[in-house]
Regions:
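Catalytic cores and adjacent flexible loops of soluble metabolic enzymes
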Residues: 1-346
Length: 346
């Protein structure tokens, strides 16, 4: 499939997406610096999020409207306050998209309600990403799919039945290009909860492209995902975790993102195809195999023994498997020590 000017799928390297999220820390200048740092790191896509606190929740401080997870960086924060801190003002979208396009990377967003889809359509967004927490919001999925643009859905927490319902809704609404991202909806996510072996199963089960929305630290999990068929890798991105911000603790810094781009591309290149025998590059190494060599000076008529014939490097003589056949045979001519043994000598 094609997202903007970028091909996405198994025939090309992985599509690496830097997720800005709320790491702009309410500064458009910082947001632009993140775009530029992402492009410099070599990513192919930059994603933001399109919502306001009021499109996400209501302004209540009751217990059920607070984050209650001692392992969460947002422990104790009300949902409304969190989204007020993290949201990207809608008037920033156009300059962010424009700058990303100037730098040659695909800019797109995650809409969280239908008004966000309508707004992103006015910006000619090239695709849509549905977040894990919205992957059961069938009306939203249908609205985004109805645009006819590629649709990316994170699968965090979703059962097979829930995913089946969401995928059917997307396709019924007109989605033809679908990508499902394996995702562990914890922040950060431990590698053991990532379950990457799900990737090939997702691809087979839903006949679509697959990828990873990676909340683990480091690059190892993403590299492994590419080895298992991921065509898309999404990682949260910030200028520096030390700067703080709602998602900074589990976001990649520029040097790490650059490493991710390089290592996932290497992993994809290494996949190759099912193949045996020497590659073109390996053929010159065949000479360093072991083969049969005469290791003592011999006169015509001398008998070959284990003392005067050995399997050694280089590989210009008979293969070692013929040692048993040549032992006990006489040489036809004088043979100098270090001569590759061939059938013409016995």
């Amino acid at each position: 499939m094609q997202i903007d000017q970028r091909q996405v799928g198994p025939g090309v390297g992985p599509f690496i997406v830097a997720e800005m999220s709320g790491n702009h820390n309410k500064s458009l200048v910082r947001a632009m610096e993140i775009v530029e740092a992402a492009a410099k790191a070599g990513v192919h896509g930059l994603k933001i999020q399109t919502y306001t606190p009021d499109t996400m929740t209501i302004d209540l401080d009751d217990r059920e409207f607070r984050i209650r997870d001692s392992n969460s960086p947002w422990e104790g924060t009300s949902l409304y306050r969190l989204y007020g801190e993290a949201y990207t003002p809608w008037e920033w979208h156009q300059p962010i998209f424009d700058r990303a396009r100037e730098l040659g990377i695909v800019a797109f967003s995650t809409p969280f309600d239908n008004t966000a889809v309508d707004f992103l359509e006015s910006l000619n967004a090239p695709c849509y990403k549905i977040a894990s927490f919205e992957n059961t919001d069938v009306p939203l999925i249908s609205r985004a799919a109805a645009t006819g643009k590629p649709l990316i859905i994170s699968t965090g927490m979703a059962t097979v039945a829930e995913l089946d319902e969401s995928v059917r809704a997307a396709r019924d609404a007109g989605c033809r290009d679908l990508i499902l991202l394996k995702c562990a909806s914890t922040y950060p996510a431990p590698p053991e909860d990532t379950n990457l072996l799900t990737l090939p199963h997702l691809r087979e089960l839903f006949d679509c492209e697959v990828g990873l929305s990676d909340h683990t630290m480091g690059v190892g999990v993403s590299v492994a995902a590419v080895a298992l068929g991921a065509s898309v890798i999404e990682k949260h991105f910030t200028l520096s975790r030390a700067d703080g911000g709602v998602d900074s603790t589990f976001s990649m810094e520029p040097a790490e993102m650059a490493q991710l781009v390089v290592e996932t591309e290497r992993a994809w290149q290494a996949l190759g195809q099912v193949r045996y025998g020497p590659t073109e590059a390996e053929k010159k190494s065949l000479q360093f195999r072991r083969s049969l060599y005469v290791v003592q000076d011999l006169r015509a008529g001398d008998v070959l023994t284990r003392d005067n014939v050995r399997a050694i490097r280089p590989g210009l003589g008979l293969p070692p498997k013929y040692l048993g056949q040549v032992l006990g045979k006489a040489v036809k001519q004088d043979v100098k020590r270090g001569t590759a043994l061939g059938w013409e000598l016995v």
